[in-house]
Amino acid sequence: VENLYCFRGEFPILARISFDLDYGQIISLHGPNGSGKTTLLKTLAQIIPTEKGKIINNSLETCLMGHENCLKLDLTVFENLKFWADIYKNPSINSDISTLGLVQILDVPVRQLSAGQKRKVSLARLLISKSKLWLLDEPDASLDEDNRKLLNKIMASHLLENGAIIIATHSTLNIKNVLPIDITRYKRDENTSIDQFVHGFQK
């Protein structure tokens, strides 16, 4: 990432973000709610267009897990997983189901699941996608302590397999060599125009 600006509408809220992320590395984004972590992740995922700066990802397959679980509530857990498997062209998801301990709820409609169970089903999309780069926005939301430990284990395994992760979280990660980024270092008043924004840095 080189000299990246992130926008809400026409106004930049983050500026001049630069960092390198290699295979097997994890970056943790820190900052209070509303500081721009979600906007940065969506920009990295190209959901929000890049207006200024560069994102060079060497054509890495990327999977974004946001605040929303993106589940079809009237379908069963298995039907949701099968839907994602078809999208990502992954014919075998049995190991992913087992890893997340979803076997017992495969035939349960998602609507009947607890918040924590829904989050676990959503996490399965990361494994099913086989993406090298995971962009995670508070992925441990609604998870209990045991499942947070499971999430840490899954992330550590992904890194060992030469994956890469950028995560926004308020939790302490039990993973070695986390590279922290304080997002508030790049924060600007979102009511400042781009011309005012750049002029402010030039001062």
Which residues does each predicted region cover?
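Catalytic Walker B motif of ABC-type/P-loop ATPase nucleotide-binding domains
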Residues: 134-138
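Conserved ABC ATPase "signature" region
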Residues: 91-106
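Conserved structural motif at the start of ABC-family nucleotide-binding domains
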Residues: 13-16
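Hydrophobic anchor residue at the start of the ABC signature
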Residues: 123, 162
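The feature captures the beta-strand-to-loop junction immediately N-terminal to the Walker
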Residues: 30-32
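Conserved ABC ATPase signature
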Residues: 109-118
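Q-loop/switch helix immediately C-terminal to the Walker
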Residues: 68, 73-92
